[in-house]
Amino acid sequence: MQPVNIIGGGLAGSEAAWQLASRQIPVRLFEMRGREKTPAHSTDKLAELVCSNSFRSDDPNSNAVGVLHAEMRKMGSLIMMIADQHRVPAGSALAVDREGFAEAVTNRLQNHPLIEIHRERIDHIPDETTIIASGPLTSDSLANAITELTGRDALSFFDAIAPIVYRDSIDMDIAWFQSRWDKGDGHDYINCPLNKEEYLAFHAALLAGEKGDFHEWEKDTPYFEGCMPIEVMADRGIDTLRFGPMKPVGLDDPRTGRWPYGAVQLRQDNALGTLWNMVGFQTKLKYAEQIRIFRMIPGLEKAEFARLGGMHRNSFIRSPVLLDEYLRLKKQTNIRFAGQITGCEGYIESASIGLLAGIFTAADKLDKKVSSPPVESALGALLGHITKNADPDHYQPMNINFGLFPPISEKHPKKQRKAMMAERARKALDQWISEEAFLKSSILEQ
């Protein structure tokens, strides 16, 4: 059987290789580290953890990340198996001994008889079945090859992430639905008004807020005029924001009948309408500062954030436009993408998309049928966001969170609602595995 090529030996590529080889599919795994260095990595080990040693919450009953952990364990994930073996104390979080973890993943893949590891840089995309899992620091030559394949505007080289707020945490007694000048259907934006005193206090807080540092390899990341950090714009002058992302013109506050002094707009971020993006609020403020300062905005005093803002060097494609529900490139279905280059954010999210890419590719190679995971599961919710549910015109990397799951129809307290979503996800994944003959047999054989 012709081997599957996997480009990139990070978490996604390593997981995809394991899923394929475990189903008796030969793999050629290409990783340039060992021959060439990257600005971020310090070793040539596969699945090296670059920033943190934490896989975040391991609580499967009330945290979306913990639900994803549990699902991956159930699916026979190599990354989760090795993480559990190299766990270090971290309360309810899953943290690992990063050196032991990467060493163990490397040894497991090196010693698998169906996996060949090639220490070389790939400058072009092979014609054979290939999974591209090259990560946020994709080499320039491979990025050029991806651009040639997908189109000039399909690949981004840095992210400019604005915070995302859960819709049900916005105070609609203060905020209101309206598009500027009443364009659109009237429900395209949620608006939060500020009077002069509130605006000046917010502006001062932005300037004084503690900023995060760039990693060494990110220090040359450019600020483009269209996605300047909100605090950098604020530093240009007291009224810069009022003529930019906080422009109030064309917005009538129902409580006063007038335009506010300043306004923050939130735009719907997913098809379910559960997540709303703070328009133009990309930022390098530290996370705790973002929560404190953005809760100064009227209507967001009790805001719960599905994602906080940031700016990083990060290569990722416009997956909702380019990929089908099986992570295949629509225009060339022998090519799949996996990991952070698809626009998922986080170690475990990257590994989970690698897991799915490996399973889907194995099914193709063995001429078997397998459906995509149910949207009620964490795997299905993340996959659905990447491939179809996210706004393709404003696509930015996303962590797993309960805002990606279909909402619970009945009204319940937040804690109970999360527990209900977690339980629903467990049942949905179990049913999916039991009904998919290919999954049922191949997971048992691992």
From Swiss-Prot:
Keyword Metal-binding assigned: no
Gene Ontology terms: cellular component: cytosol
Cofactor(s) annotated in UniProt: FAD
Superkingdom to which the source organism belongs: Bacteria
Binding annotation for FAD: 8-13
A Pfam family recorded for this sequence: GIDA
The keyword Methyltransferase is annotated on this UniProt entry: yes
Cited Gene3D superfamilies: FAD/NAD(P)-binding domain (3.50.50.60)
Keywords: Cytoplasm, FAD, Flavoprotein, Methyltransferase, NAD, NADP, Transferase, tRNA processing
InterPro entries tied to this protein: FAD/NAD-bd_sf, MnmG-rel, MnmG-rel_CS, MnmG_N, TrmFO
Record's subcellular location: Cytoplasm
GO biological process terms, semicolon-separated: tRNA methylation; tRNA wobble uridine modification
SUPFAM superfamilies recorded: FAD/NAD(P)-binding domain
Coiled coil: none
Catalysed conversion reaction: uridine(54) in tRNA + (6R)-5,10-methylene-5,6,7,8-tetrahydrofolate + NADH + H(+) = 5-methyluridine(54) in tRNA + (6S)-5,6,7,8-tetrahydrofolate + NAD(+); uridine(54) in tRNA + (6R)-5,10-methylene-5,6,7,8-tetrahydrofolate + NADPH + H(+) = 5-methyluridine(54) in tRNA + (6S)-5,6,7,8-tetrahydrofolate + NADP(+)
Enzyme nomenclature, EC number: 2.1.1.74
Annotated GO MF terms: flavin adenine dinucleotide binding; tRNA (uracil(54)-C5)-methyltransferase activity, 5,10-methylenetetrahydrofolate-dependent
Top enzyme category: transferase
Function summary: Catalyzes the folate-dependent formation of 5-methyl-uridine at position 54 (M-5-U54) in all tRNAs.
Family: Belongs to the MnmG family. TrmFO subfamily.
Protein name: Methylenetetrahydrofolate--tRNA-(uracil-5-)-methyltransferase TrmFO
Species in which this protein is naturally found: Zymomonas mobilis subsp. mobilis (strain ATCC 31821 / ZM4 / CP4)
Name of the coding gene: trmFO
